[in-house]
Amino acid sequence: MAVVMDCGLNQIECSADTECDMLYSDRGYLDEWSDSVARESAEKGINIASMYTGHGTYSTLGLTHTDRDCRERMLTQWLFPHIDNAAKLKAIAGFYCHAFDDSALQDPRLYAEYKDILYNQMGRIAVYCAERGVMPSLEQMYSPQQYPWRISDAKDLIKGISRRYAPMYITIDTGHQYGQQLFLKPTREEILDAVSEGGKLYVGPEKCARIFEDAKSGEISADQAADEILEINEAYPHMFAERSDSDTWKWLRELGRYSPLVHLQQTDNKASAHKGFSPADNAKGCVTGEKVLRSLYEGYCLPEEEGMPEPLDKIYLTLELFYSIVTSGNDIIKDLKASVGYWRRFVPEDGIPLDELVKNLGVR
């Protein structure tokens, strides 16, 4: 907490995947940890705004595991204790810990089954949170197996869970839009050109990839391959994004008012590297304070959307920066201070209304 205060901040997002992992730690330790954090944060005037867990994102299928017992364990022994910790600290419970197995992506019927499983899991999470006075915030991702990865998915999930169970919100990450542009539905012309040039092209499910390779090897004609691929892909809408799904600013306009946490990272929209906002990284990146604030404001100006929960009256802009294990502590703190300094140019004090922040952009 001393480092956070030295950076000029008094709001913290705790990572549950370092000091208080729910599967590696017993309940006694978790209670001791949360009690000590609550005590020290109160003494120092620090607000624990959110608790976040994403440790399982790339190591387990988690909430949508193919095994029912594994799914239940992830829910009841990972997420529920995580929510309990957040409740003790009066914090938002942020999370992402699931993925669809490739077999589900390759079978539309199986995909629908696992999507239902996910919605049921999310519903149980939403209810558990509501009973404990905790706001849940699911992080949006950027590939077909990581639902929700498209704007339409996020809206469908928020509406479906909020209507049937209890309010559900999402976390928008400013670097989680680069992947969608790699999963666009190919046109006939793109297929023909790629076959002719012997190049690479994302064509959707595995059966289409095999057809594409057969065409490149000359086993079938390019026209036949294009016909078959386009026909098959009609049954696999879950494997394709719209180009606008890679637009960070559209995500913020469409869904920012339902995102209690916005994870900030600098990016060139070619990777989710979680860079900071130093002058060097800003020179290579596309994320700016002005774009973030204007996009959020434009979203609040839109009419309320039927089926969505009430727009939020508070959003935490949260630096989520990653560093190499060989980066020194001093260099990390230096980069953190530079990043905080950059964002303080746009948000000089916490709690300033969004419309005032946007108005101030014109006089900077």
Where are these regions (language model features)?
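Catalytic-core regions built around general acid/base machinery
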Residues: 31-44, 118-129, 157, 250-254, ...
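Active-site acidic/histidine proton-transfer and metal-coordination neighborhood
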Residues: 43, 59-172, 179, 335
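Histidine-acidic metal/acid-base catalytic patches
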Residues: 2-8, 148-364
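N-terminal pre-domain/capping segments
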Residues: 1-88, 123, 130, 217, ...
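A short helix->loop->beta-strand "cap" motif at the edges of active sites that frequently abuts
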Residues: 44-46, 91, 134, 301-303, ...
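Conserved beta-strand positions in the central sheet of alpha/beta enzyme cores
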Residues: 11-13, 50, 94-95, 137, ...
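Charged helix-capping and loop-helix junction motifs
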Residues: 28-34, 111-115, 119, 151-155, ...
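Active-site-proximal loop/turn and secondary-structure-junction residues that shape catalytic pockets
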Residues: 16-20, 54-57, 99-101, 140-144, ...
